[in-house]
Amino acid sequence: MSRNLGMRAKVLIKPLVLFQIIDSYERRPKGDNQVIGTLLGRNKEGHFEITNCFTVPHKEHPEINRIDLDIAYASEILELNMLTYPNERVLGWFCTGKSVSRSASLLHDYYARECGEVQPLHLVVDATLKSQRLSTRLYCAVEIGVPGGTKGLMFSLVPLEISNGNSDLVALRSIEKQSLQQGTKQLDRFIPELVQVVDATRDIQQRLDLVLRYIKDVLDRKRKPDNVVGRALHAALTAVPVMDPDKFRLMFNTNLRDMLMAITLSTMIKTQLEISEKLSCMQDQ
């Protein structure tokens, strides 16, 4: 497809790509204001379909309006992805934010080389969800300027549609249904492991409240101190390393996200095995 026909193309995007971008934004390093990554997909006779993506580490230099991408990392991840999905090609890049950033022209030059004959697409995702909606906009750069003079880039909007296959619709409806449900019963049916974590956390909270009340009563001379209890508390406190609350919160949330991801994947695998077993039984009959 010609570079000049990129804006006329029909562009579809898989819902999983948007979930990947949101997950990358939630896991971004502390201090980073945005997430940048590569868009992968297929181009079938002018019909683009964005099916995958991955995040590329970067370093921002706002004082000189420059962003340094880890090109070596991007090349390695792209090679690994090509081994797994040989039909996917680089279609452009994504960036989180409300609008096209000033560094978009610099990133466009890099991805123009990666895309070859196809004009790179630029996806902007507002992952803050302040308006309770996921805002997505797709752009394609067009060269502007006078012949023989200085030329620049103008990013024009490109129509973007979410590709909803049968499997995608089932997953999205399940997510929507669970998000609208409230109460412990629904949570217990969907992710019982998370309910166990909540119950264990409540039990720890009750035990901590009991210990704090005991210490307060001893300090207020309302209760006689017990040397055995004191030594046990000292041993328990010294056994746990002192950790900053923010670091502990970050570590806990990271482990919780990993656990939820593992639960989701295991549930999907279990469902797929059950469906395969039923299909096999139908074929035997």
From Swiss-Prot:
Q: What is this protein called?
A: Eukaryotic translation initiation factor 3 subunit F-2
Q: Which family does it belong to?
A: Belongs to the eIF-3 subunit F family.
One Pfam family, short name: JAB
- Entry-linked InterPro entries: eIF3f, EIF3F/CSN6-like_C, JAMM/MPN+_dom, MPN
Q: Where in the cell is it found?
A: Cytoplasm
Mind telling me which HAMAP family this protein's record contains?
eIF3f
Name all MPN domain ranges. 11-145
Q: What does this protein do?
A: Component of the eukaryotic translation initiation factor 3 (eIF-3) complex, which is involved in protein synthesis of a specialized repertoire of mRNAs and, together with other initiation factors, stimulates binding of mRNA and methionyl-tRNAi to the 40S ribosome. The eIF-3 complex specifically targets and initiates translation of a subset of mRNAs involved in cell proliferation.
Q: Alphabetically, which GO biological process terms does the record hold?
A: formation of cytoplasmic translation initiation complex
Any Gene Ontology CC annotation: eukaryotic translation initiation factor 3 complex, eIF3m
Supply the PANTHER family for this chain: EUKARYOTIC TRANSLATION INITIATION FACTOR 3 SUBUNIT F, EUKARYOTIC TRANSLATION INITIATION FACTOR 3 SUBUNIT F-RELATED
Keywords from the UniProt entry: Cytoplasm, Initiation factor, Protein biosynthesis
Q: Name the encoding gene, please.
A: eIF3f2
MF terms from GO for this chain are: metallopeptidase activity; translation initiation factor activity; translation initiation factor binding
Predominant location category: cytoplasm
Q: How does it assemble?
A: Component of the eukaryotic translation initiation factor 3 (eIF-3) complex. The eIF-3 complex interacts with pix.
Q: Does the keyword Membrane apply?
A: no
Q: Does the keyword Cytoplasm apply?
A: yes
